[in-house]
Amino acid sequence: MLLSLVRCSTKRQWAISSTGIRLLSISSPFLSTGSSNSDFLMNLSGSTRSSKHNNLHNNDRTPINKYKSNHGPKKVHSNYQLETKIQPKKMHQSTKFKKFSIKWTTGSERAQKAANEVFQKILGLSPNGVIKALNLETNEIETSSIFQFAKGIDLDRHGFIIANVERTTDHKKIPLVKLIEARVALRRYSDKVADRKQKELIDLGVIKSSKKYDNEKEKVGIKHIRVSWKIKETDLAKQKTNEIQSALKKGHKLCIYLDDKTRTNTDWVDDFTIPAENSNKKISKREKLNRTAILDAVKSLLEEEDTFLSFEGNIENRMLIKSTPKTLSTSKNKEALDEKKVLKEQKKQERREKLRLRTEKKQDTVT
């Protein structure tokens, strides 16, 4: 005998049966256009219990056929269907795990692929689907679920991206999801696909590496670290200190950004600007002492290793500290000198060859 349960409220209706959970009539306040109430099916049925265990609770369960005949829910159309596939369990797993697959009913095939790629990234960061999104009704960022957020999205008009990833106190990741225009989502997806194909062809040796690809390889060795002017002493002494020291030990170049703003977008590095020299804003003496202490602490960490340091900006606004390992710079200088020597040697050989040809011509004319 199987369990069937119906729970109703003003905002949401659940129907739990042996085939899974059916979620009905949940309006999403995170969409810019008013979407009608819709339903989607989540086949979340796991591995069945043993028959002996089921027989112990037969008295508490009602037949599923009886529920279907009396309480069949109305069918409502949705912009996508969310399904799960039960994957075979691995040797070290005690239970089977589930993988989501989405079938969108709106948007082109390419738009659906772009949405699915972002959807899978979100589930990779937050397996239970917990996200943060902007509620356009209250104009505030609220905690929600990607399943509720994606419900009713018209891919012909909108797409969605991961704008930022926040970490909780228990080290869990919560993606900040943002709605964007459909054409922007398609362009971003096309650029990513093109970059992936180009890298594959370069790795296979089919095409030569471009300057853009070489610059990206160089940027891999650069570590970007943010330090807020309002950081706590404990966080600076533990988290940021470990982050800076580990990057220095690995021989990375460092760019440390000191700012008083909490940036929520993923492109905060590109948005960071150095203020003009005359744009010093007034801060209190206490704030200035606090910022000076933070700057001195960061400088002392960087000076522990053999590095070149450069400073941009000012303590009243924001600052950028660049750290380059001296060993890296000296090795680059050696490579540059070696290249110059090779070029000089080539030029000498060319001159000798020209002289030899001239002398041979003169001898031929004399004879």
From Swiss-Prot:
Q: Give a Pfam family name.
A: mIF3
Q: What is its main location?
A: mitochondrion
Top-level taxonomic group: Eukaryota
InterPro entries named among the record's database cross-references: AIM23 (IPR029427)
Which keywords are on file for this protein?
Answer: Mitochondrion, Transit peptide
**Where does the record say the transit peptide is?**
1-31
Q: What is this protein called?
A: Altered inheritance of mitochondria protein 23, mitochondrial
Annotated source species: Vanderwaltozyma polyspora (strain ATCC 22028 / DSM 70294 / BCRC 21397 / CBS 2163 / NBRC 10782 / NRRL Y-8283 / UCD 57-17)
Q: What is the lineage of its organism?
A: Eukaryota, Fungi, Dikarya, Ascomycota, Saccharomycotina
> Which gene is annotated as encoding this protein in its UniProt record?
AIM23
